[in-house]
Amino acid sequence: MEASVLSPTSWEKRRAWLRQSRNWQTQVLEEEAAAALQDVPDPEPSSLDDVFQEGNPINKIEDWLQDCGYSEEGFSEEAGQFIYNGFCSHGTSFEDDLTLGAEATLLAANGKLFSRSFLETARPCQLLDLGCSLASSSMTGGTNKTSSSISEILDKVQEDAEDVLFSLGFGQEDHKDTSRIPARFFTTPSQAKGIDFQLFLKSQVRRIEMEDPCLMLASRFKQVQTLAVTADAFFCLYSYVSKTPVQKFTPSHMFWNCNHPTDVPSIRILSREPEPQSPRDRLRKAISKMCLYTCPRDRPPPPHNTPKRNSLDQVVLEVMDKVKEEKQFLQQDSDLGQFSQEDPVPPAEGKKLPTSPYPCVFCCEEETQQRMSTVLAPSQTLDSNPKVPCCTHSLPIEDPQWSTDPAQIRRELCSLPATNTETHPAKDETFWKRKSRARKSLFQKNLMGRKVKSLDLSITQQKWKQSVDRPELRRSLSQQPQDTFDLEEVQSNSEEEQSQSRWPSRPRHPHHHQTFAGKDS
């Protein structure tokens, strides 16, 4: 079969049959055209064109419409006869060109005008208007044959009389397409169903509930995942600045690595944490997830972890520790100096003055003033490094033999503070005022911004010698203004008493002797 189909003899037979069919069709068309020319009388005005003549226009329009319907019915019958008899065209553009060529030769040969009836029989269809309906088309009763050329489609469609009349201005109402549709199509609604948006939304909600909400967007859409990571980065920065934990968009097993601001941001996937076993841990974890302002604690804090102190309290404690250390250091130096240093003043009348192992009143006052000076300015006190003299204050008694009874010495020493308190009440008041001002200045004044000059021992000794010679200068030095710096006052008083202990003046001994005598009496 394949050889017979593809053989050259079969192709030749097909070509010969095609040529014969074309020649036979052209011969038939020429014979029909010649017979029509012989039967056609002289051209007269057609009845269809009587509309534009004088007379009653309404009757002429009705006649024209009836003639249009008659011509359509006649054409449909003739078309059916042509198809039944086998005179239907094969539907190729070449045959259409042959038909037009035959008509052109007939027109040129005879030189006569063809009537509309001949054009309808020779070319069955009028020139088409693609906007016309199928009801007015000539193909309603014709064949269902598929057209393959534009000329055939144009021939099969006729003009619509209603469209022509509405175009010419006839008709009082607006021309609507619904007027041609029967009323039975509008009595009942359409049974077609579109998209039910409520059902669609319900299915979407059901799918969201079945899937994991944390993994739904981040795993499906790359763009949403990128936006979530970016949002987490900004939330991480916000939580670092505001010191409040913030819930993230990304799943719990993924987090934004923002430990250091210079680190490159990256996403690390961690292993899932084990679920807490005890109800207390589960309740704590649930509360930490629900509340944004509570920091989740995976493990309890260690017992040795103490709460952080306030910065001001920490500074005060550090200052007090330093003061205690410096006090202990100064006390050790004073104890060593009591046994090492000798008395620089020679005794009167060749008698040696005994040294008492107990501190006297002057040494106690000097020690307290030195402690206050270390509290105010420990660095300046260490720089000056004043030497604490030993307690060598002599107590002149009428008996040339010094008593070595310790009980008597204790009684005498205990009586000295009382005597000193009675004789110098104003000095104690000024001392406590200075101490209170020193405490206030420790926390209110800026010690680093003010410069304090260290006082040398030689300068103090020179001032003391001048004050011995000039009592007015000593009185002015003792009555200093209240707005001077407290550290200078404390140090000057301590240096004065040190010099008094080294070089005791003559008029003070009778005063003490009289006080002691009055106390014994």
UniProtKB/Swiss-Prot annotation:
Biased composition (Polar residues): 331-341
Region (Disordered): 331-351, 461-521
Compartment(s) of residence: Cytoplasm; Endoplasmic reticulum membrane
Taxonomy, superkingdom: Eukaryota
Predominant location category: cytoplasm
Biased composition (Basic and acidic residues): 466-475
GO biological process assignments: COP9 signalosome assembly; positive regulation of T cell differentiation in thymus; positive regulation of T cell receptor signaling pathway; protein localization; T cell differentiation in thymus; TCR signalosome assembly
Name of this chain's protein: Protein TESPA1
